């Protein structure tokens, strides 16, 4: 989910 938002991965 947050992969593209602030680079969670």
UniProtKB/Swiss-Prot annotation:
GO cellular component: extracellular region
PTM comment: Conversion of fibrinogen to fibrin is triggered by thrombin, which cleaves fibrinopeptides A and B from alpha and beta chains, and thus exposes the N-terminal polymerization sites responsible for the formation of the soft clot.
Signal peptide per UniProt: none
Record key words, sorted: Adaptive immunity, Blood coagulation, Coiled coil, Disulfide bond, Hemostasis, Immunity, Innate immunity, Secreted
Protein's job: Cleaved by the protease thrombin to yield monomers which, together with fibrinogen alpha (FGA) and fibrinogen gamma (FGG), polymerize to form an insoluble fibrin matrix. Fibrin has a major function in hemostasis as one of the primary components of blood clots. In addition, functions during the early stages of wound repair to stabilize the lesion and guide cell migration during re-epithelialization. Was originally thought to be essential for platelet aggregation, based on in vitro studies using anticoagulated blood.
Assembly and interaction partners: Heterohexamer; disulfide linked. Contains 2 sets of 3 non-identical chains (alpha, beta and gamma). The 2 heterotrimers are in head to head conformation with the N-termini in a small central domain.
Name this protein carries in UniProt: Fibrinogen beta chain
Protein's gene: FGB
Biological process, per Gene Ontology: adaptive immune response; blood coagulation; innate immune response
Compartments (UniProt record): Secreted
Domain notes: A long coiled coil structure formed by 3 polypeptide chains connects the central nodule to the C-terminal domains (distal nodules). The long C-terminal ends of the alpha chains fold back, contributing a fourth strand to the coiled coil structure.
């Amino acid at each position: 989910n947050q992969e593209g938002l602030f680079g969670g991965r």
